Amino acid sequence: MTQLQSLGRNDQRTGSEGSAVIKGIDDELILAARLLLATLFLIFGWRKLRDYSGTVSQILQLGGPMPVLAAAVAIFMELPVAFAVAIGAFTRASALLLVLYTLGTALIGHRYWTVTGADQVDSMDGFYKDLSIMGGFLLLYITGAGKYSIDVLCGIAAP
């Protein structure tokens, strides 16, 4: 049976239909997904850390709760937790934390239902991008870190 014929059949490892178009690169694709998902958070987490007072001001302007604490939580989620995803350490727990964090940022930072015009379009764009990112983290929770990860290296997860 060719690889294309096997598409749609159950994948023995994940139980999902056709986990990859080309079998054998699942772990490489999971690594790429982890790195891509983490990139946004690492870039903006570093920015938030470098301008902590600006981060607090932005949260205050958005009407976020406890801006000083919220800024610290944002930096924690976007730097060490996203870094854990990137290297595949505590991947499932980190992915779930980032799902919850991203839901919070969507609901606090992108309330498109409270604005009109161009602001509404921008907020709606951010809101639905956040939902899409949440979907990526949920998939990462389901698949796990893959072979190229600290989780596998330390025996936390099977390859």
Give the positions of each predicted feature.
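Short juxtamembrane and helix-loop transition motifs at transmembrane-helix boundaries
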Residues: Y52-P65
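Extended, low-polarity transmembrane helix blocks
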Residues: T2-D51, V68-P159
